[in-house]
C-alpha cells in the first residue's frame, strides 16, 4: 500500500527488524504484546530500557513500560491503555496508527533516522508469525500490509470497557482521550471540582471526594464564574452531542499530551502538593503599585497570585517585583525595632517642636542637631537664679540692645561677621529668613503657665518667635550652665516676679546669623580667631553694662535683642528690614538678673542643677536624624575642638548591615498573568475546534471509505494530531512559565523578609527570629530547587521541540525534492529524446550542405 498507512507500516518494519519476538505484519495485532513499541524505543534510545529483559507473555508490563517511557522521556502522550491491550485480542487499528505516528514524528529527524541495528549479542532471531502473535485470529493475516476501511470500521464497532469516561460515562473518542491516575477522561470532563477549569498535569491535586480533583494554580483566582468555568458549558449547549464529546476529549487529550511534560516534572507536582502555600495558598495583589492594600493573612509575602476578590476579572500584570506591600510592612516593622529611637520624639509638646514627619517634609527652621556644635556647655548644670532686683539687669540689657541696634544700623564691619562663626548652618538660616516674616506670632500667654509649673527656667515660651516654635533648641536653657538673657521677655511676657528665663546660645547664634543674612546676605561667614576665645561674662550687678562687652559679644547680644522683639504686637516692626532702628526698647520689669556666657567659655564652674530631665531630652533630640545635616562650613571644625569634654555618642546609621532592597530574581522576560491566561483561553478554543474536527474525522475513518479518500483522511488525521500536540505542548510551557514566575516572586519575597530579619542586630534577636530564619532559609532552598527543576524541564522540551521542527522541515524538503526530482526526470527524459534527434538531424544537414557550399 502506497498510502500513509503503508508508509507507516514499512517504517515500523525497518525499526523492529532484527529484534527477538517482534514481527510487524499489521498495525493492530502485531503491537498487542508491546514488544514492538519497546523495540522502536530501544533502537533509537537504548539507554531508556533493557529489551533483553522483556518477556513476550507479559503483555501488560511491556505496554506499560513503553507508554511510560515514551511519555516521561520523549513527551509522547499515552493514547493507549495497557489494560486495553491485554483485554482486546485485536487492538484498535486507528489508535495504534495514531500512537505510532507520534513515534515516527519524534524519531524521523535527520540525525535519528539512520539508527544502527541491534547488537549481535542480543540474538535477534526473527520468530515465526505464530510465535509473534499467539492470539492471532484467522482473519488477521488477511489484513497484512493493506488494511481495508472495512477493517477499521469493524474494529471501531466493539467498545472496550475502558473507552468510557470515568466522569460522565460516555464514549471517549481517540482525539479526546486523557489518562489520569489510571482512569480515562474527556478533557472537558477532567476539570476542577471548585472552579470548573480544565486541569493539567502538575497543577492539580485530589479533591475532597474520591475521584475528584482540584486545581492548585487557579482555583482561588477564578472562582465559579471564572475564566474557563462557564465557557465550555455554554459551548456544550450550542454544539451537538458529537461536538460536546469532542470538547470532552479535548480535556482528556490536552491533559494527556500535557502529561508528557508533567511527567518530566513529577517532582514539581509533588512539591506543589506538599507545599501548596509556596505557590497557591496566599493571595497577592496583582500590581506592584497596590502597596496600600491591606496585608494578607499569612506570615510571609505571597507569590503573584490574585486574591479571591479578583475572581471575576483576570489579574493585571505584575512585574516581578511582587508583593512589595508586605515587604514594606515588614521593613517598617524591622525599622521600628532597629531604629526605635528615630520613631519617637522626646521633645515635650509645650515646646512646640514639630513631629518627625513634619521635619522631613517641611524645610527646617532650625536643625535640632545644632546643639551638637555646642554640646559641652549644655552638660553643665545651670545656676539657680538669684533673687536680686530686676532693675540693673534691665538697664544693662537695654544698653546692650540699643548698642547692638545702632551697630546693626551702621553696618559696622567689626560687628557683622563676628556672630556668624557660631552658626555653621547659615544656608539653612537664609532659607528660613525668607519664609518667616509671613508667619504671625501667636499669643504669649497660654504656653506661659505650663513651663512655670515645671521649672523656673522654662519661662522661655515658644511664642516669642516663629523660629523657636519649630525647633527644639529653646529647651536647651534648662540644661545649659550659663545663658545669655536678652530683652526677649520684655515683649513676650507680662511683668511678673518670676525669675527671668534663659536663652540658649545656639538660638542667639541663629538669630544673629539670620539678621546678618537679611542685611548683607552676600557676606561670607567669618572664622573665629580661636575656639577658646574668652567669652564675656556679664554678672547680674548694677556695675555691668554694655561697655564691658567685647565687640563680638556685643554684636551677639545686640542680635539677641531682635530675638526678643517679635511679639503679638511688635512682629511687623521687628521684621521690617528697612527700619531696624525702630525696635522697641522698653525695659522688662519682671526679670531677674541672669549671668551671660557665650559658648566659648568652658572654664567657668557652675553649681549643680536640681533637675536633669531637660538635659536627657536634649540628648535624644540631637539623635533624631544625623543624615540630613548639610556639610558644615569651616567654622564647625573649630567649634568641635572647643568641645573637648564628653562628646555625645553618635547614633548608629539607620539600618544594620546591607540596605533593604528587594532583589529581582526573574530569569526570563516576565509574562503578565493576564497574557498567560489569555493565551491559554485561545489554546483551549483551538483545542475545542480540533477535537470536534477529530471526532468527525474519526467517525469517517471508521465508517468506511474508498482507498483514495481514506489516504487523504489519514493525512488530515495525522496533521490534526500533530497540531493538537503542538497546542498541548504550548499550554504545558505556559503552565511552567506561570509556576516559574510564582516561584521567582516567592523567592524575592523570602529573600526580602530574610534581609529584613538579618538587618536587625543580633543582640536584639529572639528565639522566634532565629526559628524564622531557619524556616526562611529552608524555604529559599526549596524554591531554588523547584525553579531549577522547571528550567530543566523547559530545556528538555525546547530541545525536543527543535528536533521535531527539524524533522518536519527535513521531511518536507525530502518530499519536495523527490517531487522535483521526479518531475525533472520526466522532463529531462522527454527533452533528451527529442533533443537528440533534432541535434543529430541538424548535424547531418550541416555536413551535407558544407561540401556543396565549398564547391
Curated annotation (Swiss-Prot):
Low complexity bias spans: 124-135, 499-514, 555-570
Domain bMERB: 663-810
MF (Gene Ontology): cytoskeletal anchor activity; identical protein binding; metal ion binding; phosphatidic acid binding; small GTPase binding
Membrane topology designation: Peripheral membrane protein
NPF2 (motif): residue ranges: 625-627
Coiled coil: 679-703, 794-822
Annotated positions of the Phosphothreonine modification: 313, 316, 461, 463
GO BP term, pick one: neuron projection development
Compositionally biased region (Basic and acidic residues): 356-367, 815-826
Segments for region (Necessary and sufficient to associate with tubular recycling endosome membranes, mediate phosphatidic acid-binding and membrane tubulation): 692-855
Region (Mediates the interaction with RAB13 and intramolecular interaction with the calponin-homology (CH) domain): 644-855
Subcellular localization(s) per the UniProt record: Recycling endosome membrane; Late endosome membrane; Cell projection, Cilium membrane; Cytoplasm, Cytoskeleton, Microtubule organizing center, Centrosome, Centriole
Modified residues (Phosphoserine): 293, 307, 464-465, 478, 480, 613, 682, 732
Pfam families linked: bMERB_dom, CH, LIM
Alphabetized UniProt keyword annotations: Cell membrane, Cell projection, Coiled coil, Cytoplasm, Cytoskeleton, Endocytosis, Endosome, LIM domain, Membrane, Metal-binding, Phosphoprotein, Protein transport, Transport, Zinc
Annotated region (Disordered), positions in chain: 110-165, 226-253, 269-659, 815-855
InterPro entries: bMERB_dom, CH_dom, CH_dom_sf, F-actin_Monoox_Mical, Znf_LIM
Described function: Lipid-binding protein with higher affinity for phosphatidic acid, a lipid enriched in recycling endosome membranes. On endosome membranes, acts as a downstream effector of Rab proteins recruiting cytosolic proteins to regulate membrane tubulation. Involved in a late step of receptor-mediated endocytosis regulating for instance endocytosed-EGF receptor trafficking. Alternatively, regulates slow endocytic recycling of endocytosed proteins back to the plasma membrane. Also involved in cargo protein delivery to the plasma membrane.
Name of protein: MICAL-like protein 1
Source organism: Rattus norvegicus
Underlying gene: Micall1
Amino acid at each position: 500500500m502506497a498510502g500513509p498507512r503503508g508508509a507507516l507500516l514499512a517504517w515500523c518494519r525497518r525499526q523492529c527488524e532484527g529484534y527477538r519476538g517482534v514481527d510487524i505484519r499489521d498495525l493492530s495485532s502485531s503491537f498487542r504484546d508491546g514488544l514492538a513499541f519497546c523495540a522502536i524505543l530501544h533502537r533509537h534510545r537504548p539507554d531508556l530500557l533493557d529489551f533483553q529483559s522483556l518477556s513476550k507473555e507479559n503483555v501488560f508490563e511491556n505496554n506499560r513500560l513503553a507508554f511510560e517511557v515514551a511519555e516521561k522521556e520523549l513527551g509522547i502522550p499515552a493514547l493507549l491503555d495497557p489494560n486495553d491491550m491485554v483485554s482486546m485480542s485485536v487492538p484498535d487499528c486507528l489508535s495504534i496508527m495514531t500512537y505510532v505516528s507520534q513515534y515516527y514524528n519524534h524519531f524521523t529527524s535527520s540525525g535519528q533516522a539512520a539508527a544502527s541495528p541491534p547488537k549481535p549479542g542480543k540474538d535477534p532471531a526473527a520468530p515465526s508469525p505464530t510465535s509473534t502473535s499467539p492470539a492471532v485470529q484467522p482473519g488477521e493475516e488477511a489484513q497484512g500490509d493493506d488494511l481495508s476501511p472495512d477493517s477499521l470500521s469493524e474494529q471501531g464497532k466493539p467498545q472496550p470497557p475502558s473507552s468510557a469516561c470515568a466522569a460522565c460515562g460516555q464514549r471517549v473518542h481517540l482525539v479526546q482521550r486523557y489518562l489520569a491516575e489510571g482512569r480515562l477522561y474527556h478533557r472537558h470532563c477532567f476539570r476542577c471540582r471548585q472552579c470548573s477549569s480544565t486541569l493539567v498535569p502538575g497543577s492539580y491535586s485530589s479533591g475532597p471526594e474520591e475521584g475528584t480533583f482540584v486545581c492548585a494554580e487557579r482555583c482561588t483566582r477564578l472562582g465559579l464564574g471564572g475564566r474557563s468555568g462557564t465557557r465550555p458549558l455554554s459551548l456544550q449547549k450550542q454544539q451537538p452531542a458529537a461536538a460536546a464529546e469532542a470538547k470532552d476529549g479535548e480535556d482528556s487529550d490536552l491533559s494527556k499530551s500535557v502529561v508528557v511534560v508533567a511527567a518530566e516534572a513529577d517532582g514539581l507536582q509533588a512539591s506543589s502538593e506538599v507545599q501548596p502555600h509556596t505557590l497557591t495558598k496566599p493571595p497577592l495583589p496583582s500590581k506592584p503599585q497596590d502597596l496600600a492594600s491591606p496585608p494578607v493573612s499569612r506570615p510571609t509575602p505571597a507569590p503573584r497570585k490574585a486574591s479571591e476578590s479578583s475572581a471575576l476579572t483576570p489579574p493585571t500584570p505584575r512585574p516581578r517585583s511582587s508583593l512589595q506591600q508586605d515587604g514594606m510592612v515588614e521593613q517598617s516593622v524591622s525599622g521600628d525595632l532597629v531604629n526605635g529611637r528615630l520613631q519617637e520624639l522626646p521633645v515635650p509638646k509645650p515646646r512646640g517642636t514639630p513631629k518627625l514627619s513634619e521635619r522631613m517634609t517641611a524645610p527646617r527652621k532650625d536643625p535640632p542637631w545644632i546643639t551638637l556644635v555646642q554640646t559641652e556647655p549644655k552638660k553643665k548644670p545651670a545656676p539657680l537664679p538669684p533673687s536680686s532686683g530686676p532693675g540693673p539687669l534691665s538697664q544693662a540689657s537695654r544698653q546692650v540692645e540699643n548698642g547692638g541696634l545702632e551697630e546693626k544700623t551702621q553696618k559696622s564691619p567689626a560687628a557683622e561677621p563676628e556672630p556668624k562663626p557660631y552658626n555653621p548652618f547659615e544656608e539653612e538660616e537664609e532659607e528660613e529668613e525668607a519664609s518667616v516674616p509671613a508667619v504671625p506670632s501667636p499669643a504669649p500667654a497660654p504656653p506661659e503657665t505650663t513651663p512655670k509649673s515645671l521649672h523656673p527656667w522654662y519661662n522661655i515660651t515658644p511664642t516669642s518667635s516663629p523660629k523657636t516654635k519649630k525647633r527644639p533648641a529653646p529647651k536647651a536653657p534648662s540644661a545649659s550652665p550659663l545663658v545669655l538673657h536678652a530683652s526677649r521677655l520684655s515683649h513676650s511676657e507680662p511683668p511678673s516676679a518670676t525669675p527671668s528665663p534663659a536663652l540658649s546660645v545656639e538660638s542667639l547664634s541663629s538669630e544673629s546669623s539670620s539678621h546678618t543674612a537679611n542685611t548683607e546676605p552676600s557676606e561670607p561667614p567669618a572664622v573665629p580667631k580661636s575656639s577658646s576665645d574668652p567669652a564675656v561674662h556679664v554678672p547680674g550687678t548694677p556695675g555691668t553694662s554694655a561697655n564691658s562687652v567685647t565687640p563680638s559679644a556685643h554684636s551677639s547680644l545686640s542680635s539677641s535683642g531682635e530675638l526678643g522683639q517679635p511679639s503679638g504686637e511688635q512682629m511687623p516692626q521687628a521684621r521690617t528690614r528697612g527700619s531696624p532702628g525702630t525696635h522697641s526698647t522698653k525695659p522688662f520689669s519682671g526679670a531677674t538678673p541672669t549671668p551671660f556666657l557665650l559658648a566659648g567659655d568652658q572654664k567657668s564652674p557652675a553649681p549643680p542643677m536640681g533637675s536633669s530631665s531637660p538635659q536627657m531630652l536634649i540628648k535624644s533630640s540631637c539623635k533624631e536624624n544625623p543624615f540630613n545635616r548639610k556639610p558644615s562650613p569651616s567654622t564647625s571644625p573649630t567649634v568641635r575642638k572647643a568641645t573637648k569634654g564628653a562628646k555625645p555618642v553618635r547614633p548608629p546609621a539607620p539600618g544594620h548591615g546591607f540596605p533593604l532592597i528587594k532583589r529581582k530574581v526573574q530569569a526570563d522576560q516576565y509574562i503578565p498573568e493576564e497574557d498567560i491566561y489569555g493565551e491559554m483561553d485561545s489554546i483551549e478554543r483551538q483545542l475545542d475546534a480540533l477535537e470536534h474536527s477529530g471526532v468527525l474525522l474519526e467517525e469517517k475513518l471508521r465508517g468506511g471509505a474508498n482507498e483514495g479518500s481514506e489516504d487523504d483522511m489519514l493525512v488530515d488525521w495525522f496533521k490534526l494530531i500533530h497540531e493538537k500536540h503542538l497546542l498541548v505542548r504550548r499550554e504545558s510551557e505556559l503552565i511552567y512559565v506561570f509556576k516559574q514566575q510564582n516561584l521567582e516572586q516567592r523567592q524575592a519575597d523570602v529573600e526580602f523578609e530574610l534581609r529584613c530579619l538579618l538587618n536587625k542586630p543580633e543582640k536584639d534577636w529572639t528565639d522566634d527570629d532565629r526559628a524564622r530564619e531557619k524556616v526562611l532559609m529552608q524555604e529559599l532552598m526549596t524554591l531554588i530547587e523547584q525553579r531549577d527543576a522547571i528550567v530543566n524541564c523547559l530545556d528538555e522540551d525546547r530541545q525536543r521541540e527543535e528536533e521535531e521542527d527539524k524533522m518536519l522541515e527535513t521531511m518536507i524538503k525530502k518530499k519536495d525534492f523527490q517531487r522535483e526530482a521526479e518531475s525533472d526526470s520526466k522532463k529531462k527524459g522527454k527533452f533528451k529524446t527529442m533533443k537528440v534527434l533534432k541535434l543529430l538531424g541538424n548535424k547531418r544537414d550541416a555536413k551535407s550542405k558544407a561540401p556543396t557550399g565549398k564547391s
